[in-house]
């Protein structure tokens, strides 16, 4: 599974974003992380495009790395209070993951954490969403899984949320990231690939062949980007690698083993 519509670009995807904004609902929750979105000017552009289309915009900022369950509930309250009919997530994996669960929680009369971990039931209705990706590596826009930290329970666990109806992946939007964060994202992509690759069955199959190609490309393009941070092609390839690692293509015919991620979740909680 993957977003219904995906737009890949090496330069700013303004036209694609505007086309998608023409299709969305009237009341929009604009979700993002810290101040960098405003500092780069992207926030003002998106606000302007939404207002040009007569949309009512509600801010949902301050989504932290490793988003908390409290932040999810804050977003759900905003959606209910302002009758939000579309969630626009702008950011990296944390923003994108948080909104997946917000989208699901709003449609439920019960606590989504208890629903999934006590009753082992999963949501089936969601508020529509779109994503503008500003950091590659997590591939979060490609699936409906989210990792949320429950501070009260001291747990960091996966939750099932919504799929995005569209995703804008433009490598130009990652140019403002520190190189250290770009490198970390590439290693996250490698970890996704490896944890799929090492999973059963360990027999020859096409998924493994594609996986090997993606891993080779991550290593090659990351080296190129470190040597030349202005290499837009290498930057775009890393974003494409990130998407391929998490859009389920590499998981076909595999019993994935994400124990390295699970160990990190336990430590990170």
PLM feature segments, named:
Residues 254-269:
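C-terminal catalytic subdomain
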Residues 75, 98-103, 193-194, 218-221, ...:
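Buried hydrophobic packing segments
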Residues 1-86:
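ATP/NTP phosphate-donor binding region
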Residues 70-172:
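Glycine/threonine-rich beta-strand-loop-alpha-helix active-site module
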Residues 2, 156-160, 266-269:
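Short, intrinsically disordered, charge-balanced linker/junction segments flanking boundaries
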Residues 145-255:
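Carboxylate- and glycine-rich phosphate/diphosphate-binding segment that chelates Mg2+/Mn2+
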Residues 19, 48, 77, 104, ...:
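Short, well-ordered alpha-helices that flank and scaffold nucleotide-derived cofactor binding pockets
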